[in-house]
Amino acid sequence: MESIEQQLTELRTTLRHHEYLYHVMDAPEIPDAEYDRLMRELRELETKHPELITPDSPTQRVGAAPLAAFSQIRHEVPMLSLDNVFDEESFLAFNKRVQDRLKNNEKVTWCCELKLDGLAVSILYENGVLVSAATRGDGTTGEDITSNVRTIRAIPLKLHGENIPARLEVRGEVFLPQAGFEKINEDARRTGGKVFANPRNAAAGSLRQLDPRITAKRPLTFFCYGVGVLEGGELPDTHLGRLLQFKKWGLPVSDRVTLCESAEEVLAFYHKVEEDRPTLGFDIDGVVIKVNSLAQQEQLGFVARAPRWAVAFKFPAQEQMTFVRDVEFQVGRTGAITPVARLEPVHVAGVLVSNATLHNADEIERLGLRIGDKVVIRRAGDVIPQVVNVVLSERPEDTREVVFPTHCPVCGSDVERVEGEAVARCTGGLICGAQRKESLKHFVSRRAMDVDGMGDKIIDQLVEKEYVHTPADLFKLTAGKLTGLERMGPKSAQNVVNALEKAKETTFARFLYALGIREVGEATAAGLAAYFGTLEALEAASIEELQKVPDVGIVVASHVHNFFAEESNRNVISELLAEGVHWPAPIVINAEEIDSPFAGKTVVLTGSLSQMSRDDAKARLVELGAKVAGSVSKKTDLVIAGEAAGSKLAKAQELGIEVIDEAEMLRLLGS
């Protein structure tokens, strides 16, 4: 007679086998009812013997309790995005760039896949067992969705087969088939629940549930398309070979993956998929085209946040016709005035569209748009609604000219348009309510001053009630004043006050980024902070001095110089410092007096480090007299390459710049 352990092992093995046949091979051998019977038998045995339950059991897909919030997972290898092409000419230009970059006229073959319209995820297996899963997030850090991913039956909790790597990070797309999407919405309408606009939104909403039991009820599925971390094992040296190996281990791969021998075959694949698109049963918005050879991929490298060896060939966006009811003008954080078309609502690609951006005055002139016109609306990339053209043959007689404002629609200040720029801007600065709201929202955001609990709606109310006019006013708020806001009780109000107090202790780089200087993002702010060290030195810097900072050109230097030249901005900064905003004093370093191999050198870090964080490494390098830059140029003296170094390493090699690895960096730091 079999032992309980043997029965459990056999049931789990049988169920995993049938999950593989159903989800990966699309060739089920048993009816659903038989699968359900086996699952019930396993569940009953595990209920009687809970001490024998294993984490990879098919019964353990459903989490037991909701989470309070998602924690973060940092991607060991960044999840990069892809560049897009939208027509054959652009694809052929991409193909030529690839051919030109490869030496010796090497033959290029292409692995072509469907571009699924879902949610990109990363799944980590250790010794074949699923241990974590994360969303793409910002490409560097994503949300921990492990409990939810475990509920998706297409994703194996344990890989099967031989030669499975010790650590394998699989990347792919979670999506919702059309039939499942329609059923979710049908159930929602019947029960008065939330109706989703399209399958992608439904997939994202299902996967980002704090309660995995809800995710388990949604018929999500998954196809894998790539690899991140790979340790303690090997994979084939072609992209297609890797996908086929994934399939052998039990991971689902689309059966539409195709190897193409030429650009002509790629175009034929694209048109065939476009033709079949309505019958696939799930949403796609194009095809993904990748160089098949891993060696060639490595040779081609990366640029910015995308590989040079892959591209997304998007399908033409879906279009509809409707009428322009009116054109209104919105004011953004930097004073940019953007015209927005208010439309007769129309469904485009499954979404009800009632507004579309018109970008600027030049675009209105190019379109020849008048209020009342019949227009063609497109969801560019199936996401952002835009006006494609005016249907002049059906123009009504009572259309009206669109008049671009000469004064800000919010504060009445003059509108100016700098010669050579397409964007018109309000000159009202912080006296403009619209700019004030957006500036304050940026100021408190996570990557800026990081004021926890200070959401957009709170900022809106604070500005509308005239409690806050400048960022410094935020630090004068009391719990009593906040309690008067909508949905803000005494406890929540005190939490916000505490968060503001905590935010006073920041870094020079975060403070600069929070000020919202035009063209100054996080990387530029960090570069300015590292180079000048103190606010006083930065405020006094000339445009010429500012351009000595790595990655700062004449445009950014001018914006920074003009910002600090404006008295109202200096006054706001003084108020912030008076309210207690502060950061650690810089370590004053004279590179000439430091006996260090890094002294006086411009250094760039790339890839992931295993022995210390990037921030710690930067701090140590600066202490030893280095200037740490964000990108590689002819001014770069040294590149430190960690794991999965990408385009920066390739550029350094191209320019003949010295490159060292993490081990050598640590040795030099120790010396």
Swiss-Prot record:
According to the entry, what is the taxonomic lineage of the organism? Bacteria, Pseudomonadati, Pseudomonadota, Gammaproteobacteria, Enterobacterales
Changing residue 36 to N does what?
Reduces nick joining activity by 88%
Indicate the impact reported for residue 314 to Q: Reduces nick joining activity by 99%
Q: What is the effect of changing residue 342 to A?
A: Reduces nick joining activity by 80%
Q: Which InterPro entries match?
A: BRCT_dom, BRCT_dom_sf, DisA/LigA_HHH, DNA_ligase, DNA_ligase_AS, DNA_ligase_CS, DNAligase_adenylation, DNAligase_N
User: What effect on the protein does mutating residue 285 to N have, as reported in its record?
Assistant: Reduces nick joining activity by 99%
Q: What is this protein called?
A: DNA ligase
Question: What's the cofactor?
Answer: Mg(2+)
Which catalysed reactions does the entry list for this protein?
NAD(+) + (deoxyribonucleotide)n-3'-hydroxyl + 5'-phospho-(deoxyribonucleotide)m = (deoxyribonucleotide)n+m + AMP + beta-nicotinamide D-nucleotide
* Impact after mutating residue 118 to A: Reduces nick joining activity by 99.9%
